[in-house]
Amino acid sequence: MNHLPVECPRCAFEDISLLATSPVPGVWDVVQCGRCLYTWRTIEPARRTRRDAYPDSFKLTAEDIENAIEVPAVPPLLK
């Protein structure tokens, strides 16, 4: 699709990376925030893809992330 979101819906960070694209060209992209690692498909509803529609109770700030008590580790890949 080549049209990345300008900010993360969860933490408003502006570093968004493209992780994957639809096997059917132009249908959807999978993108990820560079700060909170929130990941979404570009065809998800607005409450998952737009900061102004994202639920307030799930929004994070840079301070929230820095002061998180525990960030779960990513488990090793299965072989």
Curated annotation (Swiss-Prot):
Gene from which this protein is expressed: vdcD
Organism: Streptomyces sp. (strain D7)
Protein's recorded name: Protein VdcD
Signals that turn on the gene: By vanillate.
Disulfide bond sites: none
Keyword Transferase included in the entry's annotation: no
The protein's role, per its UniProt record: Involved in the non-oxidative decarboxylation and detoxification of phenolic derivatives under both aerobic and anaerobic conditions, however the precise biochemical function of VdcD in metabolism of phenolic acid is unknown.
Keyword Disulfide bond among UniProt keywords: no
GO biological process, one term: response to toxic substance
Source taxon at top rank: Bacteria
Note: It is not known, if phenolic acid decarboxylase forms a complex composed of VdcB, VdcC and VdcD. The term subunit is often used in reference to the operon, however there is no experimental evidence to prove the existence of the complex.
InterPro entries linked: VdcD-like
Keywords: Aromatic hydrocarbons catabolism, Detoxification
